[in-house]
Curated annotation (Swiss-Prot):
Enzyme Commission numbers on file: 6.3.4.3
Taxonomic source organism: Lactobacillus delbrueckii subsp. bulgaricus (strain ATCC BAA-365 / Lb-18)
Record GO terms (molecular function): ATP binding; formate-tetrahydrofolate ligase activity
Pathway assigned in UniProt: One-carbon metabolism; tetrahydrofolate interconversion
Top EC class for this record: ligase
Pfam families in UniProt: FTHFS
Sorted UniProt keywords: ATP-binding, Ligase, Nucleotide-binding, One-carbon metabolism
Catalytic activity: (6S)-5,6,7,8-tetrahydrofolate + formate + ATP = (6R)-10-formyltetrahydrofolate + ADP + phosphate
Keyword Nucleotide-binding: yes
Encoding gene per record: fhs
One GO term (biological process): tetrahydrofolate interconversion
Protein name: Formate--tetrahydrofolate ligase
Length: 559
């Protein structure tokens, strides 16, 4: 019987976290342990690492458009990282985002890799971990409570209850909280107003946590968060209300990177978790920079496909790092590409070369998108048991015909041994890397130009269309002097368009911009397209129905 991911993880022989840290030159005095197998790295160690003058090679991992068939991007990131570390003997760190409990209990289930390429302790990482998500949720909701109390207690600045833009947050998928009314009943219950909840990982405070370099930076960014507008339509920021210190205090521990290990004991930083469809989609700047200072190779996974997390990493996140990536990996699977053509999971286990050829257009778009930044690219095929030799040969030849190196990876079943060839190739590319990055837009471009450049170059749209609401918001942002900020486009992860049903590699379409939201503390503008939601709902059969715990406390069902 094939073991499940959680069974494999629970059978693993973990090293004490102090032994894992020692591989990076960290001592027990550099750690704040959370039990035996996980720890936060303290500020003393972070500051010391910043002064060591060393920067390792940076490898970005992205993928094709996600499908119900699965791509295994985390599995590939971990498997290749393990192979560089253990098969090639080169000091390596893996940098991943923390899973959100919403999708863990919703559609996705666990998110810590798979098979014999996982980060552990898997149950902790997927559930409460070191408490970062709880700290963020507390900070988000305390901020909202303080704002509502400010209005109730006199509202000296004249903050308009109808123009509050910050939302409350929960790390739970709950569609009933997308639109609510608070303060109902008597005045004793506060000022009645419409409100909304969003998933914790999509909130601006999550973005701020992942972009802050230290506590001072964290506090300054929180102070810049836009709360809402006055009755005279003047902006009000957190610093105007004096709440930044309290909120920063709630997040001061969460800001420190979390250290864990893979099944093969490769050090891994799992820290921060902004979604790539509604936020910037990459792990924290602090953990990536720390990894670069402490190792020779760092693999960082960007959320969803190259059009979302990949694009946001290359156009925005990498400008905040101490270096640009040296190479990139694009992950693909045979069955996911067949899904791009068939739009159904019914027959994906059956050989179908015609569907694979048709679906290849999606991978072709993604790998060329990444190459358009001038970055060296390796395409890896995550092999599944149902893949036939004919399908694998066809896909590999299609990739290589486009001038991309390609390796087939079996890390899910074989661990690092199944990723050795890919590890050798990506190390070769990273070591030889010497290029000038060509980003999608210039930082000096205005918002409309940035949006148009991403839409046309990365999505291959023909045009961009704005609602009247979005046009008004553009005018307001320009009036506020915020029209030159980077853009984070909120878009469905399933398509290059804003329509979830348009699979493959569509062209000639119009991208529909519904609204623009200032994330002043994070330093970008979120551009909402299509029907993207920042508070997901649960599916008819949520993953929660498969999760259980026995009388000994052993958890099952997290894949």
């Amino acid at each position: 019987m094939v073991k499940s991911d959680i069974e494999i993880a629970q059978a693993a022989e973990e090293l004490p976290i102090t032994d894992v840290a020692a591989k990076l030159g960290l001592t027990s005095q550099d750690l704040e342990p959370y039990g035996y197998d996980k720890a936060k790295v303290n500020w003393q160690a972070i500051k010391r690492s910043e002064e060591n003058g060393h920067l390792g090679k940076m490898i970005l991992v992205t993928s094709i458009s996600p499908t119900p068939a699965g791509e295994g991007k985390s599995t590939m990131t971990i498997g290749i990282g393990d192979a560089i570390n253990n098969q090639l003997g080169k000091k390596t760190v893996i940098a991943l985002r923390e899973p959100s409990m919403g999708p863990v209990f919703g559609m996705k289930g666990g998110a810590a890799g798979g098979g014999y390429a996982q980060v552990i302790p898997m149950e902790d990482i997927n559930l409460h971990f070191t408490g970062d998500m709880h700290a963020l949720t507390s900070a988000i909701d305390n901020l909202s409570a303080l704002v509502d109390n400010y209005i109730y207690q006199g509202n000296e600045l004249g903050l308009d209850p109808e123009k509050i833009v910050i939302k409350r947050g929960l790390d739970v998928n709950d569609r009933t909280l997308r639109k609510v009314t608070i303060g109902q009943g008597s005045k004793f219950n506060g000022v009645e107003r419409p409100a909304s909840f969003q998933l914790t990982v999509g909130h601006e405070l999550m973005a701020i946590l992942c972009l802050s370099k230290d506590i001072a930076d964290l506090k300054e960014r929180i102070g810049k968060v836009l709360v809402g507008y006055t009755y005279e339509d003047e902006p009000v920021f957190v610093k105007d209300l004096g709440f930044q210190g309290a909120i920063a205090a709630l997040l001061s521990t969460a800001l420190k990177p979390n250290l864990v290990q893979t099944l093969e004991h490769t050090p891994a930083f799992v820290h921060g978790g902004p979604f790539a469809n509604i936020a910037h989609g990459n792990n924290s700047i602090l953990s990536t920079n720390l990894a670069l200072h402490l190792s020779d190779y760092v693999l960082s996974e960007a959320g969803f496909g190259s059009d979302l997390g990949g694009q946001k990493f290359l156009d925005f996140v990498s400008t905040k790092l101490e270096k640009k990536p040296d190479a990139a990996v694009v992950v693909a699977t045979v069955r996911a590409l067949k899904y791009q053509a068939e739009k159904s999971t019914d027959h994906l286990k059956e050989e179908n070369l015609d569907s694979l050829k048709e679906g290849f257009a999606n991978l072709d778009r993604h790998m060329n998108n990444v190459r358009s930044y001038n970055i060296p690219v390796l395409v890896v095929i995550n092999k599944f048991p149902t893949d036939t030799e004919a399908e694998l040969d066809l896909l590999k030849s299609l990739i290589e015909e486009q001038g991309f190196p390609c390796e087939i990876v079996t890390a899910h079943d074989e661990g690092s041994k199944g990723a050795k060839a890919a590890a050798e190739k990506i190390v070769e590319l990273a070591d030889k890397s010497d290029y000038e990055i060509k980003r999608s837009y210039d930082l000096d471009d205005d918002l409309e130009t940035k949006i148009e450049k991403v839409a046309k170059r990365i999505y291959h749209a023909a045009d961009v269309e704005y609602t009247d609401k979005a046009k008004d918001q553009l005018v307001k942002l320009k009036k506020m002097g915020k029209d030159k900020l980077p853009v984070i486009i909120a878009k469905t992860q399933y398509s290059f368009t804003d329509n979830v049903k348009e699979l493959g590699a569509p062209t000639g379409f119009t991208l529909h911009v519904k609204g623009l939201s200032l994330r002043n503390g994070a330093g970008f503008v979120v551009v909402s397209t299509g029907h993207i939601l920042d508070m997901p709902g649960l599916p008819k059969h949520p993953a929660a129905l498969d999760i259980d715990v026995d009388e000994t406390g052993k958890i099952s069902g997290l894949f």
